[in-house]
Amino acid sequence: MRKIVIAGNWKMFKTQAESQEFLKEFLPALEETPQEREVLLCVPFTDLAILSQSLHGSLVQLGAQNVHWAENGAYTGEISGPMLTEIGVRYVIVGHSERRQFFGETDETVNLRLQAAQKYGLTPILCVGETKQQRDSGETESLIVSQLDKDLINVDQTNLVIAYEPIWAIGTGDTCETTEANRVIGLIRSQLKNSDVPIQYGGSVKPNNIDEIMAQPEIDGVLVGGASLEAASFARIVNYL
């Protein structure tokens, strides 16, 4: 049976003080959340240590937003797997479209980060997806297959989550039709050696569409951006019907 993974990606939002205020409202709202749902918060590096303490013993797992492929070294601005696992981080987002778009991430560096994450005991969340131009040109399927082929070289598919994030739906308010998201996620699954890899949908996920999204048979969770920044909003998503 495939695992359900509901992840909030805070991106570059929330100071330590703001993260603590969030938890005061968020954690009590999870008292009746089914235990089999894996809930995680992928937060800025500055929030990781304090949230590791605050989330201890709760249902919520801690995630980071990036990891370098080296154990240590002269890589200014980067962070290593051992640094993350030491403070209780369990998951890490790899290859998010914003990293690819703004910071020069390539399929080759994504692959190195995926391997490093697993080497140091982290579960990576690999993000794949197409732009509006690529979708309009009919390139969605070929692009995603290419990303998977390059990104997953020597990656253990028993310790992996994949997020399908159509780039044109991220932060735009435009949500991919749920049946279309389900179709593309089915395509992703057909390319994998392990059909039990949890595959999430990401892109303008909100309380008013989560139930429809999670009713799709191929979708195993969501990667939530803006709607994860507000406690009541993210709690409603976690507690989908």
UniProtKB/Swiss-Prot annotation:
Source organism: Nostoc sp. (strain PCC 7120 / SAG 25.82 / UTEX 2576)
Biological process terms in GO annotation: gluconeogenesis; glyceraldehyde-3-phosphate biosynthetic process; glycerol catabolic process; glycolytic process
Keyword Cytoplasm applies: yes
PANTHER family: TRIOSEPHOSPHATE ISOMERASE
UniProt KW keywords: Cytoplasm, Gluconeogenesis, Glycolysis, Isomerase
Localization (cell): Cytoplasm
EC number(s) stated in the UniProt entry for this protein: 5.3.1.1
GO cellular component: cytosol
Pathway: Carbohydrate biosynthesis; gluconeogenesis; Carbohydrate degradation; glycolysis; D-glyceraldehyde 3-phosphate from glycerone phosphate: step 1/1
Amino acids binding substrate: N9, W10, K11, G171, S204, G225, G226
Record's protein name: Triosephosphate isomerase
Coiled coil stretches, renumbered: none
Enzyme class: isomerase
Subunit relationships: Homodimer.
Entry's family note: Belongs to the triosephosphate isomerase family.
InterPro entries reported for this sequence: Aldolase_TIM (IPR013785), TIM_sf (IPR035990), TrioseP_Isoase_bac/euk (IPR022896), Triosephosphate_isomerase (IPR000652), Triosephosphate_isomerase_AS (IPR020861)
Catalytically driven reaction(s): D-glyceraldehyde 3-phosphate = dihydroxyacetone phosphate
Predominant subcellular localization, coarse grouping: cytoplasm
Catalytic residues identified in the record: H96 (electrophile), E165 (proton acceptor)
GO MF annotation terms: triose-phosphate isomerase activity
Function: Involved in the gluconeogenesis. Catalyzes stereospecifically the conversion of dihydroxyacetone phosphate (DHAP) to D-glyceraldehyde-3-phosphate (G3P).
Pfam families, sorted: TIM
